[in-house]
From Swiss-Prot:
SMART domains to which the protein is assigned, alphabetical: Ribosomal_S15
GO terms, molecular function: rRNA binding; structural constituent of ribosome
Family recorded in the similarity comment: Belongs to the universal ribosomal protein uS15 family.
Function, in words: One of the primary rRNA binding proteins, it binds directly to 16S rRNA where it helps nucleate assembly of the platform of the 30S subunit by binding and bridging several RNA helices of the 16S rRNA.
One Pfam family here: Ribosomal_S15
Protein's UniProt name: Small ribosomal subunit protein uS15
Alphabetized NCBIfam families for the sequence: S15_bact
GO biological process: one example: translation
GO cellular component: cytosolic small ribosomal subunit
UniProt keyword terms in alphabetical order: Ribonucleoprotein, Ribosomal protein, RNA-binding, rRNA-binding
Subunit structure: Part of the 30S ribosomal subunit. Forms a bridge to the 50S subunit in the 70S ribosome, contacting the 23S rRNA.
InterPro entries in UniProt: Ribosomal_uS15, Ribosomal_uS15_bac-type, uS15_NS1_RNA-bd_sf
Transmembrane regions listed in the UniProt entry: none
């Protein structure tokens, strides 16, 4: 679980407006932060299959949000993946 201070920073860095907490950009950035925090755990605990299921669910949800954003506004999509360092 990411700390609330880190979560607030991620929201602030990716928000489209001052009160934006639910745009696809913010949701993808928060999921990316959670995924990046969990990745070292699975390098150390390779047999944690129940936890890996949750990780794969987060990755799938992020992919769906990115696909939605790409369909709606390709410029915002390319800017976001460049900012977060994700592959296409």
């Amino acid at each position: 679980m990411i700390a609330s201070s880190v979560k607030a920073e991620v929201v602030k860095a990716n928000a489209r407006s001052a009160n934006d907490t639910g745009s696809p950009e913010v949701q993808v950035a928060l999921l990316t932060a959670r995924i990046n925090e969990l990745t070292p755990h699975f390098k150390q605990h390779a047999k944690d299959h129940h936890g890996r299921r949750g990780l794969l669910r987060m990755v799938s949800r992020r992919r769906k949000l990115l696909d939605y954003l790409k369909a709606k506004d390709a410029d915002r999509y390319t800017a976001l993946i460049a900012k977060l360092g994700l592959r296409k």
